[in-house]
């Protein structure tokens, strides 16, 4: 087959598949109003991660809003914000200095370094490029405002506890430094990872161990208290080749939740639970986990990853904010989704309009810098605070009438058609009672039919009397039956609520059975492992 034709055919298949993708387009009656981003930033967002964002003017937004930190323009290095931890702003920096052989003076070599990278001359680049982490105190009265620690390669995530700095580097190495002496206390490198998700989790210090979120889908647990730092456990979450870094990590007492883009792991009092799916983002709050998936699902789970509630939308969701018992998420085609945490079946959709001459979503797609914290969502140079969420509500729009109602059925017809039917019904008896012409030829027959028939004999009369008495006796029974028939049917809302409660009850029973089954499986597995170890010990003794 001709090679250009084959390439063209493949391209057509790919683009046709892209064109068939369904985008979120809610019906008019689903859009409740408009959600404005009324607050302005000085500049637009240039870069962001899970813990902060940098604006064009160097200002930094953290999890509590705009910080006092300003990253100035420096031609000798490039800085990126990693995290705010234990009173320090942590910055990762790439040095771009070049040493001139003739004058031994520093010169900017950013363009040359880029060219060398493109050519693949790694040795020359290493001579001219350096990497470091800078810790800047958020206390203006601190004795030492800045601490710089040199690194072997670029830092992706970091956190501080006391005098220790835990860093995960771009070569998938976990490092532990003494901040005062800048001494490397521990380092372990994993398998390299070529592509990673920008939502990178940070290391977490616990009482005696530090948990490193690695780039190859595992958690490295290092004991830093008892003697020299020593790795004591490797927890493999996922083994995918691409985008397999740990994107979320949180510790809550004896419970830990971690996630990659494909799997969630929950450790509850030593027991492990997994959930597999295409995971966009997640948020843990007060013992409950909220998950966004690639196919538009919003899931509510407990610690053992049992599904409590869910709603599926044909949408591409981004950001999770919980406020006033509601979950808010930003849809990439220009909508704010509001889900009631008490009733996942009911959700509201708000459209994000244009702001002045600035089109909020260019090409109806979320394609600019985004960052969110506990109460706010930042987009480009605007942000929405859900503590003061006041959408502009539209007038209530009813659902479009069905085909049957459009044909004119009384039960499901629109109100104005029902009124017409009522008018017709009221007119019909008037037409029957109209005075007919006297010489119509039917008068005599009508008069005859109206006359009561004479009672032919006494027996018939007594029978008629008995039937009347029986009718009078049966009258209460008939009234009772009529009353039973007239008992109003349960309201559709009540019926819906009852069915929903039954469904929830059945779901809860099913979850309880699944939980018991998992617990039994874990217990059997542990017993099996103990038995195998016991046998192995006996064999070694022999």
UniProtKB/Swiss-Prot annotation:
It is found in: Cell surface. Signal peptide: none annotated. Pfam families: PGBA_C. Residues 418-435, 447-456, 481-542 have a biased composition (Basic and acidic residues). Residues 399-542 are annotated as: Disordered. GO terms for cellular component: cell surface. Residues 457-467 have a biased composition (Polar residues). Plasminogen bound to PgbB is capable of being converted to functionally active plasmin. Binds plasminogen, specifically, and in a concentration and lysine-dependent manner. Plasminogen is the precursor of plasmin, a serine protease that cleaves fibrin, fibronectin, laminin and vitronectin. Acquisition of plasminogen/plasmin could enable H.pylori to degrade host components. This is Plasminogen-binding protein PgbB. It comes from Helicobacter pylori (strain ATCC 700392 / 26695).
């Amino acid at each position: 087959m001709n090679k250009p034709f084959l390439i063209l055919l493949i391209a057509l298949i790919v683009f046709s598949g892209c064109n068939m993708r369904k985008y979120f387009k809610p019906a008019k009656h689903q859009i409740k109003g408009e959600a404005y981003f009324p607050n302005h930033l000085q500049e637009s967002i240039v870069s962001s991660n899970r813990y902060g964002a940098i604006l064009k003017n160097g200002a930094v937004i953290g999890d509590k809003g705009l910080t006092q930190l300003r990253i100035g323009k420096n031609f000798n290095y490039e800085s990126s914000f990693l995290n705010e931890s234990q009173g320090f702003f942590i910055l990762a920096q790439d040095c771009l200095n070049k040493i001139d052989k003739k004058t031994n003076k520093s010169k900017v070599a950013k363009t040359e370094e880029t060219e060398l990278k493109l050519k693949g001359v790694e040795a020359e680049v290493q001579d001219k490029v350096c990497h470091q982490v800078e810790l800047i105190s958020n206390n203006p009265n601190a004795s030492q405002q800045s601490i710089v620690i040199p690194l072997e390669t670029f830092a992706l995530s970091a956190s501080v506890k006391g005098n220790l700095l835990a860093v995960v580097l771009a070569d998938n190495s976990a490092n532990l430094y003494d901040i005062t002496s800048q001494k490397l206390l521990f380092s372990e490198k994993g398998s390299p990872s070529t592509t990673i998700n920008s939502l990178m989790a940070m290391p977490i210090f616990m009482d005696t161990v530090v948990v490193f979120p690695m780039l190859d889908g595992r958690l490295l647990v290092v004991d830093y208290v008892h003697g020299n730092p020593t790795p004591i456990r490797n927890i493999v979450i996922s083994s995918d080749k691409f985008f397999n870094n740990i994107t979320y990590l949180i510790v809550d007492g004896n419970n830990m939740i971690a996630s990659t883009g494909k799997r969630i792991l929950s450790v509850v009092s030593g027991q492990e639970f997994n959930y597999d799916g295409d995971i966009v983002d997640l948020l843990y709050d007060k013992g409950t986990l909220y998950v966004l998936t690639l196919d538009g699902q919003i899931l509510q789970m407990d610690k053992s990853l049992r599904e409590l509630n869910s709603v599926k939308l044909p949408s591409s969701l981004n950001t999770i904010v919980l406020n006033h018992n509601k979950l808010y998420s930003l849809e990439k085609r220009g909508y704010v989704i509001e889900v009631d945490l008490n009733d996942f079946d009911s959700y509201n959709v708000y459209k994000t309009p244009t702001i002045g001459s600035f089109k909020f979503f260019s090409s109806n797609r979320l394609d600019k810098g985004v960052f969110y914290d506990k109460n706010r969502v930042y987009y480009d140079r605007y942000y929405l605070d859900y503590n003061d969420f006041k959408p502009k509500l539209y007038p209530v729009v009813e659902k479009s009438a069905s085909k049957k109602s459009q044909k004119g059925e009384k039960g499901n017809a629109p109100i104005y058609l029902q009124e017409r039917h009522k008018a017709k019904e009221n007119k019909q008896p008037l037409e029957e009672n109209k005075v007919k012409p006297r010489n119509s030829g039917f008068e005599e027959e009508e008069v005859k039919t109206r006359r009561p028939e004479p009672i032919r004999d006494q027996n018939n009369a007594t029978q008629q009397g008995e039937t009347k008495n029986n009718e009078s006796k049966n009258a209460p029974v008939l009234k009772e039956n009529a009353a039973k028939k007239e008992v109003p049917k349960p309201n559709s809302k009540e019926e819906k609520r009852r069915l929903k409660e039954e469904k929830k009850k059945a779901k809860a029973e099913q979850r309880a059975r699944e939980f018991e089954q998992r617990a039994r499986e874990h217990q059997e597995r542990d017993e099996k492992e103990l038995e195998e170890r016991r046998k192995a010990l006996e064999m070694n003794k022999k």
